[in-house]
Amino acid sequence: MTSTEVRVTQVKTQRQLRQFVTFPWRIYRGDRNWVPPLISRRLAFFDRSQSPFFQEGNAAPFLALRDDELVGTIAPAINFRDNEQLGRKLGVFGFFECVEDYGVACALFDAACGWLRERGMTLIRGPYNFGNSDDPGFLIGGEDCPPVMLEAHTKPYYAAFAERYGMCKFVEDYAYRIDRRPVANDAELIPERVVRVAEYAQKRAGVTVRQAHLDHWDDEIPIARRLFNTALTHLTDFIPLSEEQFRHMALEMKPLLDPELVYFAEVNGEPVAFSLALPDLNRVLIHGNGGRYPWDWMRMWWASRHIDVISFKIMVMLPEYHGRGLDAILYVNTAKAALRRGYRWMDMSLVAEENTQVRLLVEKMGGRIFKRYRVYEMAV
């Protein structure tokens, strides 16, 4: 099939948007490793009156049709705030799904590139569901198990289609898994050398570690935001999160938080590092069928009582404390809490391929790569 036999149209109506949002059910039918997103949340994501993204950007969901049959979706997007701050003309694409037909993929990529080009963009990058932490990358390894939260499960041919279209690798990220092995004493599960590093660092630097106060989460949010933004300023494409952005993210996350999995490290009473791990919501969503029917919510409620996986998502520290072992301190505290809480295994992701320091520590903790994701880019 050639791309000329495929008609691509921009979503204009609520009916079309619902078709866009529910199309993945066709692509992943029978795939036990796919985690259906909540339909209500996906619809709200594209609601310009609700979604925070549209306060600083624009996006256009597209449908690919062949003989009036829906065969693919894509959504190019532009974050004007980020582009202005970084002096770039970058667009992203996300929500890419298609049948196993390169002609369909080509038509979708053509539509996304064309939409971005018309708006003055010179580069396309993705897949991202608009944000760098929203299902980034095509899965290129690890299709044999479900993803953890904020990560994607995609068809193996997607990456091949992107490369055939002319896209090149921009970055590769790894998801690590640390399993709880059967041992006589749980303390044996945390490598002794990592514990020694953490204990020595804690004494030498005078570090105290405290759990986050979830009863006063509103007071913790600005502290976490300051640490997050300051710690990541060295990254080339990093844009500090505004107070509104970070607050929205933190409040949305609050119902999922376990106080024993959120830590601040302090020196002389001043916060210098922050870490956060979450019970993996995907262990719930995988049973929910997108929340289409009342019984889907009952199944999710039941599954929520038996989450046995945590996902370590954030570990940041002030630049002047790099190399002092604070990462080991926070990792060890989280691992001990996970063991106390009875979690079966811990995900640590995503870790960039070039982030050798974090990868080394995770591997010392017993982590092994169980998923690989690749983000692509090309000139438009």
Task: Please report, for each region that a protein language model flagged, where it lies by residue.
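Acyl-donor binding region in acyl/amide transferases
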Residues: 83-167, 288-364
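Flexible loop/turn segments at secondary-structure boundaries
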Residues: 17, 80-83, 132-134, 183-185, ...
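A conserved beta-strand-loop-helix scaffold within acyl/acetyltransferase catalytic domains
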Residues: 24-66, 74-84, 211-316
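TRNA-binding/sensing appendages of the translation machinery
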Residues: 2-44, 113
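Acyltransferase donor/substrate-recognition loop-hinge adjacent to the catalytic core
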Residues: 3-6, 152-237
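Short beta-strand segments
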Residues: 125, 177, 264-266, 276, ...
